[in-house]
Design a protein with these regions (language model features):
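Low-complexity, acidic Ser/Thr/Pro-rich "mucin-like" tracts of secreted and single-pass surface proteins
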Residues: 569-587
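Non-catalytic, solvent-exposed segments at the cell envelope interface
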Residues: 2, 7-9, 13-19, 28-570, ...
Length: 587
């Protein structure tokens, strides 16, 4: 072969090699583009699946079948993203500035999303296996501490997840990242609080500990809860739990008064709450203040001091009964279907033994509440469902807990079971002063309106309509008049109070000069006036106040009433009995 032929062949070979490399590069670009497009498409699918489930930990913990199927779809989409971007052929893409950022983001999101789902799934296995351990007194404390440790571990794992780059992402990846970030934040809160609660409950049950147990009846309302008509104790130690017999709370009235510990409660309600009569407590929706006073009254005549108090009402009992099944009591079978009607009205219709015995009627809830609470610790309960269903009970103020132990009280506050108010609260309470059982027939509707007044203040107007729908023919014990009462039969007499943010000024009630209560109430301010509403009639009470523009959010606090109070915001009615935060700018 001549030198010219050799040179030609070498040139041809070099051209072929170059062309081949260019072809390979083009094919690789097509392949990488396809894999990247597939990954972005899968990310879009994951985003859609995330939208459908909203990564609600509550449904996750409850084991909802449809939710499980949706989560499986999210997991599948995230795994498809990961597989599309894996392998040695995709490695070079990671160094390309913009494209590489998308690849690194999609890979990190798929990996973190799958890990997050795995963490919660693993925890659910532990929770499912915890049921038998919670039934046995000798295993209860250890089981709760194991749950606390597992939730703490899940919290640590979630906190370590890396979602990859945050800036300059494709819209699909940016949206998936936002959703996953929000879900992880919620998960971190859930695991942190869950771990704290499991640990504190374990410590309580390890004991020795003693709490007052109060049974509140929503047929006769106080501020933020029903009136505590019966009381007993929950005594715990070494994992065992004993719920003592409950007696009418008025039997615990004192011969001499106990000082009201909370200064605002004393200043606002000292004229009515005398420190002796249990039925005259509970005038403020700030449960920590009224609870501390109740425990002080209880301990004034007890040899063994209670650390705190737990208050449950028929709605809390209904939730427990859904999980434990019915209980047999001296008044018959009580289950989740009949407990509300029974205690709010049915028990007063002559359905109880001893129809003429008012003491028996008054104490009927006391016969049931200990049985239901005791069964909570012995029945075979789905722990995940318990976690799920107690959420609304807590949010609706149907389960309230206070402890004199400041560390333990801090946990109750974090869980939302403390009944505390904050400086953004709006709470409307209707306190029964009949005394009768007409709250079951009384509706509360509050419309909120906001008008901006310059750059510094907004004027807020609360228009509350109270309607007495008591039917004719109710027993005297329900509609009155009670002996010694000035309230006519079928009429509702009470005090309607409004707790508003502490920063509010110029708080007033239209056409009312002589207020029943006015002034600071913890982080809020309160005003109130008496109302007398005849059967079939309504009363309208209008409150106005100026709110500094620095207050940007309001928390609508539920009252635990039934019928549930209605809030009207922007013409839209909201009636779920749950706490809600609203933006002042949207009112």
């Amino acid at each position: 072969m001549t030198s010219s032929q050799v040179g030609g062949w070498q040139g041809f070979s070099r051209r072929n090699v170059v062309n081949f490399l260019i072809l390979v590069l083009l094919l690789w670009c097509v392949f990488a583009g396809y894999r990247l497009t597939r990954a972005v498409s899968a990310a879009s699918d994951a985003r859609g699946a995330l939208d459908s489930v909203d990564l609600d930990y509550r449904a996750w913990m409850a084991g909802d079948d449809q939710f499980d199927a949706d989560i499986a779809s999210v997991r599948s989409s995230l795994e498809k993203v990961h597989s599309s971007l894996s392998g040695p052929l995709m490695a070079p893409v990671r160094i390309v500035p913009f494209v590489g950022r998308q690849v690194r983001s999609a890979d990190a999101l798929s990996e973190s999303g799958s890990q997050m789902i795995g963490v919660v799934d693993d925890l659910l296995v532990v929770i499912d296996e915890a049921g038998p351990g919670l039934q046995a007194a000798d295993k209860r404390v250890a089981t709760l501490r194991l749950l606390a440790a597992q939730m703490a571990e899940a919290h640590a794992t979630l906190g370590s997840l890396d979602l990859g780059p945050e800036e300059n992402l494709l819209s699909q990846l940016r949206e998936v990242r936002t959703d996953l970030s929000d879900a992880i934040e919620e998960g971190l809160h859930t695991m942190e609080v869950g771990s704290e609660v499991a640990g504190e409950v374990a410590a309580l049950l390890d004991g020795p500990s003693r709490y007052v147990l109060g049974a509140a009846n929503n047929a006769e309302m106080r501020a933020g809860s029903g009136l505590v008509l019966s009381a007993g104790e929950i005594v715990a130690g070494s994992g065992g739990v004993l719920v003592t017999e409950m007696t009418p709370s008025w039997t615990r009235n004192l011969g001499s008064p106990v000082a009201i510990p909370d200064a605002d409660l004393r200043s606002r309600w000292g004229w009515l709450t005398d420190g002796q009569n249990w039925l005259l407590n509970w005038m403020s929706p700030r449960f920590p203040a009224t609870a501390e006073h109740a425990v002080a009254m209880w301990n004034a005549q007890s040899d063994q001091l209670a650390e705190g108090i737990v208050v449950v009402d028929p709605f809390a009992l209904r939730t427990i009964l859904r999980l434990t099944g019915p209980v047999e009591t001296s008044i018959g079978t009580v289950d989740a279907q009949n407990v509300i009607e029974l205690f709010l009205n049915g028990q007063y219709q002559g359905s109880l033994p001893g129809t003429g015995d008012q003491v028996l009627r008054r104490d009927s809830l006391a016969d049931v509440a200990p049985n239901v609470v005791q069964k909570l610790f012995t029945a075979d309960i789905d722990v995940a469902r318990l976690f799920d269903q107690l959420r609304d009970v807590v949010d609706g103020r149907h389960l309230l807990i206070w402890s004199a132990d400041t560390d333990r009280q801090r946990v109750w506050e974090r869980v939302g079971v403390s009944g505390a108010l904050d400086d953004r609260t709006i709470a409307v309470s209707l306190i029964n002063r009949g005394p009768n059982k007409l709250d079951y027939f009384t509706n509360l509707r509050t419309e909120i309106a906001v008008v901006r007044e310059g750059d510094r203040f907004a004027t807020v107007t609360l228009t509350t309509t109270i309607t007495n729908r008591t039917p004719v023919g109710q027993p005297q014990y329900v509609e009155g008049p009670v002996q010694g009462s000035i309230t006519p039969a079928g009429a509702y007499r009470g005090i309607v109070t409004f707790n508003v943010p502490g920063a509010a000024i110029n708080v007033s009630i239209d056409d009312v000069d002589d207020l029943s209560v006015a002034g600071p109430d913890g982080p809020t301010r309160v005003v109130g006036t008496e109302v007398l509403i005849e059967r079939g009639s309504s009363a309208v009470v209008i409150v106005r106040f100026d709110l500094p523009n620095r207050v940007t959010e309001l928390t609508l606090e539920p009252s635990a009433r039934f019928p549930i109070e209605t809030w009207v915001i922007g013409g839209e009615s909201r009636r779920d009995g749950l706490s809600e935060t609203v933006l002042v700018s949207e009112l």
